[in-house]
Amino acid sequence: NHNPVPIIKPEDYELNFFINTKFINKFTLEDLKKMKSKKVITTIQCGGNRRGEFDKTSGTQWGIGAISTAEWEGIPLCNLLENYNAKYIHFEGYDGVKSSIPFKKGRNCFGDVLVAYKMNGVELPRDHGYPVRVIVPGYVGIRNIKWIQEIILEDEEIDSSWQKGIAYKILPGSIRCLEDVSKINLDDIDTINELP
């Protein structure tokens, strides 16, 4: 987790849905549980997994422990997006963490993106996003926002350090130290989304 784990009572939970700044809808936990659900087994991996095995990297020096596989259950995000269009889907958690994915990933029902409320057949543990989180199979862990509070459709990537910061960019091999980063425009560098 990037920030402290929020304490959210299930009866107080709300997921707000916006297009740009226009409010579209609000879902309670009970609303979500009444919708048709789907189960997906996927592996989530932190973008920094095994970072400690590289030379001179910043950030937590992870070994191989920032990865796990689980069965998730929730609402296919594509079902919530049926009548909409955009370039990006922004996610914001109750903990303040913000990230985005391309709209085509979330809108594709074969992409298995979920608004999930169960993990391995039981309600989500608090550390894994209770009561609701986003699951984006095949994407770096930071795109799988926990404690999801808002889904916003936009035409630009979200402007957050977890999306546009150097930790989540595919930097060219010529970048050997932090001072070298000032020589490039980070907006021209691809954001890490998919993992092998």
Question: Could you tell me what each predicted segment is?
Answer:
Residues 8-9, 14-62:
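A glycine-rich, hydrophobic loop/mini-helix early in the fold
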Residues 64-87:
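Mid-length scaffold segments of soluble, non-membrane domains
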